[in-house]
Regions:
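S-adenosylmethionine
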Residues: 1-184
């Protein structure tokens, strides 16, 4: 499977995709973060095509079986580990991030081959950055649909699936982890 990993650095998901046998093209706009991704790939013995570019303007990339967009976000899902976020994030910053996420999501859709998959995720608890982002996208892109998360997927529990079929984890959930998990 060919996978385009947008906003890929530092590369955790890139390496998981490589380990699963995918042919990965990893994109990030930051030279420093891309170098960290490259180092991580080398250290783990994986290879991927690395593209230093803004994810919203990749004229040479198209026709991927799957496009993964882990969009820049408020990171409110990491409150369990970073409680200070509750005091430093404001509505204005979330609104600005939502605008950027929308641009990236629209761009990501252009890189998916017909019949391919687009995976959108953030580590935010904010509806504006998650479910509302996807719902708004689907209203204007009728050729895309939600593939509901199945309980048969490893590690997925019933309370993690929203009525719309989205996967939503919260810091209060444990799913076998003794110290909880991040919100996604």
């Amino acid at each position: 499977k060919s996978v385009l990993d947008l906003c890929a650095a530092p590369g955790g998901k890139t390496m998981q995709l490589c380990a699963a046998g995918a042919k990965v093209t990893a994109v990030d706009h930051s030279p420093q973060r891309m170098e960290r991704l490259r180092e991580n790939l080398v250290r783990q013995g994986f290879t991927a095509q690395l593209v230093l570019s803004d994810a919203s303007d990749l004229s040479v990339c198209s026709g991927f079986d799957c496009v993964l967009l882990d969009a820049p976000c408020s990171a409110t899902g990491t409150l369990r580990r970073h409680p200070e976020l509750a005091w430093i994030k404001d509505v204005g910053s979330i609104y600005s991030l939502a605008i950027e996420q929308r641009k990236l999501l629209l761009a990501a859709a252009r890189y998916v081959r017909p019949g391919g998959e687009l995976v959108y995720c953030t580590c935010s608890l904010e509806q504006e950055e998650g479910e509302e982002q996807v719902s708004g996208f689907l209203r204007t892109h009728r050729n895309f649909r939600v593939n509901p998360i199945m309980l048969a997927c490893e590690g997925v529990e019933e309370d993690m699936i929203t009525p719309q079929g989205f996967l939503r984890t919260l810091p209060c959930m444990t799913a076998g982890a003794s110290q909880g998990m991040d919100g996604f």
